[in-house]
Amino acid sequence: MGNDSVKDKMKGGFNKAKGEVKDKVGDMADRTDMQAEGKKDKAKGEIQKDIGKAKDKFSDKD
């Protein structure tokens, strides 16, 4: 497991959590702009985590 893959998965987890908070706060405050930003951050986090997992798979084949 490479160091880059760990960083990608950690960044992804952070962005996903940040997005979930923004989404919930935006919902409670009735701020659709904040909700949209939260959904974008969650998607970004998922993609980063997937990239980290893919890097793990490729490094395992070496």
Swiss-Prot record:
Keywords: Stress response. Induction: By phosphate starvation, via the alternative sigma factor sigma-B. Residues 1-62 are annotated as: Disordered. InterPro entries: CsbD, YjbJ_sf. Belongs to the UPF0337 (CsbD) family. This is Stress response protein CsbD. It comes from Bacillus subtilis (strain 168).
